[in-house]
């Protein structure tokens, strides 16, 4: 088990000059400080770096004799990687833990809590990220849909299919508005 902050300076030293931040991935379990026994991931805005571990996900799968081990992941691990990495990268863009809605930025104290959170940001956190990154919302949803659709061609992950469907509903709403009228109100 490694102290997560020990990675920050090393990661920062290998970050490309034109990079905004850098993330490290390890199979070895991490802990954030002596008082806490584990963390799935952590990011430091000051160091513009973060790290997350598969140690809690698949502790028996780590083989120190095989350096290629990190590339031999299955669908379950890939889904977890997407969720934890996107959460930590959002920290690097200045987002803190969300207390408003069900959100990718909710704090978690267990693997179960982390995996029960959505992949996507709530409206409050999405707006915060949009303010920092200056992205077009529709283009962002389209790029996420394209990325997840490409993953879907190579991996069978039911959560990806549901995520694509959610993105398609968001895109439809952004482009067409709410045409359902199921609330009973006339336009």
Regions found by a protein language model. Give the residues of each.
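Metzincin-family zinc-dependent endopeptidase catalytic domain
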Residues: 1-86, 92-96, 101
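Metalloprotease/metallohydrolase-associated module, dominated by Zn2+-dependent proteases
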Residues: 46-80, 96-187
């Amino acid at each position: 088990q490694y102290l997560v902050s020990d990675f920050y300076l090393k990661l920062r030293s290998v970050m490309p000059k034109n990079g905004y931040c850098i993330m490290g991935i390890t199979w070895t379990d991490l802990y954030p400080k002596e008082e806490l026994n584990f963390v799935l991931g952590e990011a430091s805005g000051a160091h513009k770096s973060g790290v997350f571990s598969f140690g809690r996900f698949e502790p028996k799968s780590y083989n120190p004799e095989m350096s290629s081990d990190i590339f031999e992941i299955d669908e379950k691990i890939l889904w977890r990687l997407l969720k934890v990495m996107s959460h930590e990268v959002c920290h690097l863009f200045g987002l803190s833990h969300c207390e408003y809605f069900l959100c990718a930025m909710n704090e978690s104290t267990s693997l179960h809590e982390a995996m029960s959170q959505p992949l996507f940001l709530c409206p409050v956190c999405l707006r915060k990220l949009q303010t920092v990154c200056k992205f077009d919302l529709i283009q962002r949803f389209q790029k996420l849909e394209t990325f997840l659709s490409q993953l879907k061609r190579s991996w069978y992950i039911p959560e990806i299919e549901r995520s694509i469907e959610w993105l398609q509903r968001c895109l439809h709403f952004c482009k067409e508005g709410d045409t359902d009228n199921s609330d009973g109100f006339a336009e």
